[in-house]
């Protein structure tokens, strides 16, 4: 075999591997979507889209209960319905025309930013999506994966870059141009490295949500793309504290292809 033949074979092989990766990714995505659909149908869990409907105001937090002033999200809402508060799915326990309360477990307060909220703080609110609702963002379960810390913000024309430091467990599932929910807001990741990621916030998002009201050092709730989490599980890659190498992902792919 000549060197040219070897090079050609190598290119063909790489093209075939690329096609196999795409086919495998499609297969995993379909499986993930089916699992997600089954989960929400069987458990009757609420599902959100990351499109914030309004900004509410904290009235009180304490004794395992949170009270929030709101308006739009209470339209058509009944006791027992789900509302995402800064990305955390809570169940409405009492309500009036312009406010509602929800019970919050101590563990939820500890693992999310809800525990640091105080009277007068703004929060992002979204009702669970109706079965015939329009899907504007991405699938958000309301069960956050952890929190991040805003490390810096930078103005860029009419947009604002927001940089967020997060744990390796969360960063391991973040990809550029992928989706992530930050305080319940569906956003696209523009940059990511080993310690932080960044999103670009347009004026409309800044106006309709609380994100640009945050300052450096503030804590935000983070939920990775649920499809990515299902794909990772289907591939058998544990979301360990360290990043998973591309070589390991390739090995998983080839093992699956060999059957």
Model-derived features: positions:
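Conserved loop->alpha-helix
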Residues: 42-259
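Short hydrophobic targeting helices and cationic amphipathic motifs
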Residues: 7-10, 28, 40
């Amino acid at each position: 075999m000549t060197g040219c033949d070897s090079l050609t074979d190598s290119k063909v092989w790489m093209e075939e591997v690329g096609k196999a990766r795409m086919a495998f990714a499609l297969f995993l995505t379909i499986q993930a979507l089916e699992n997600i659909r089954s989960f929400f149908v069987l458990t009757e869990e609420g599902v959100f889209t990351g499109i914030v409907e309004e900004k509410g105001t904290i009235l009180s937090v304490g004794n395992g209960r949170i009270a929030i002033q709101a308006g739009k999200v209470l339209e058509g809402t009944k006791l027992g319905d789900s509302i995402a508060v800064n990305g955390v799915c809570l169940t409405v326990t009492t309500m009036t025309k312009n406010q509602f309360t929800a019970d919050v477990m101590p563990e939820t307060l500890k693992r999310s930013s809800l525990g640091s909220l105080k009277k007068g703080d703004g929060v992002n609110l979204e009702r669970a999506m109706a079965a015939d609702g329009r899907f504007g963002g991405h699938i958000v379960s309301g069960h956050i994966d952890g929190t991040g810390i805003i490390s810096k913000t930078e103005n860029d024309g009419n947009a604002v870059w927001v940089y967020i430091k997060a744990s390796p467990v969360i960063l391991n599932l973040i990809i550029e141009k992928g989706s992530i929910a930050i305080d319940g807001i569906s956003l696209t990741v523009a940059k990511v490295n080993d310690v932080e990621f960044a999103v670009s916030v347009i004026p409309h998002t800044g106006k309709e949500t609380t994100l640009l009201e945050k300052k450096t050092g503030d804590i935000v709730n983070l939920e990775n793309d649920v499809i990515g989490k299902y794909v990772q599980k289907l591939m058998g890659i544990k979301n360990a504290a360290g990043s998973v190498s591309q070589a390991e992902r390739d090995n998983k792919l080839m093992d699956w292809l060999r059957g």
